[in-house]
Amino acid sequence: MLPNSINMQKGPIQVLLADDDEDDRLLFQDAFKEIKLKTEVQLVYDGVELLEYLSQEGAMKPHVLFLDLNMPRKNGMDCLDEIRLDESLKDIAVVIYSTSASDEDIEETFVRGANVYIRKPNNFNELKKILEKVITINWQYHTSGLNKENFLLSF
């Protein structure tokens, strides 16, 4: 499903988070429970599990994938590359969700085809705000040609 159809989604928005930090995964899940949007959230622990999950027959393809950069076994950059090269996955909206504020990471993920980059917030309320902002983005604008001006989102 194309990312720009998220805004017109009739059922729940399918969200997938790939993050090796258990505390971050739990906070992420709790934040979505408190946001007043219909979402279904799936969690995976690292890049290998992410790609295995996405390649399963009949697996839920997320509308939005939140992807941590620094994960064991397969990092977020490698996952992003594989997703963008796979015909069945390339249209998934990919949001880099990382503690890194490095200009190099931001530039590299932009060039490799991520749609949005957000830094992990420091508190729960900021997390809820940024997640709601990401889910309610006008994805047509964010996917119709990469624009660095709107790539880095802040809360």
Model feature map: region roles:
Residues 120:
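A Lys-centered signature of the CheY-like receiver
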Residues 43-64, 128:
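Acidic, metal-coordinating helix/loop segments flanking the phosphotransfer/catalytic sites
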Residues 67-68, 98:
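Active-site residues of response regulator receiver
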Residues 126, 131-132, 136-155:
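CheY-like receiver
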Residues 71:
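Receiver (REC) domain active-site loop signature in two-component systems and cognate sites
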Residues 115:
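Short, glycine/charged-rich "phosphate-handling" switch motifs in NTP-dependent
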Residues 12-33, 65:
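Conserved acidic segment of CheY-like receiver
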